Amino acid sequence: MLRSADIDFNKVISNKPISKDKNFLAYSTKNNKGTCRLGVSIPKSKIKNATERNKLKRVIRHQFLELESSAIDIVIVYRGTANKYDAKLISSSLQFHKKNIIKTTE
């Protein structure tokens, strides 16, 4: 299970983004916890409905489950240009970010 309760967003975001596109910004740093911690930021101004925000958070968490055993902190920031109902576009965007995070943290 990916943990997010004790991640320090400011520490991770203080670095440059690992990857970015029109949908998301992805930040990551190595940690000494031995497990992956994932933080997700979806501004209320971008997606008003809480149910839709939570659906998107579940999709993001699901995409990063395979990194669970990695010792990295990841923060994903939604930029608000993706159509929230276009699952294929969101999924391909998250795959792109995951690939870049894996490449830079090895």
Where do the PLM segments sit?
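Positively charged, solvent-exposed patches that mediate nucleic-acid binding
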Residues: 1-106
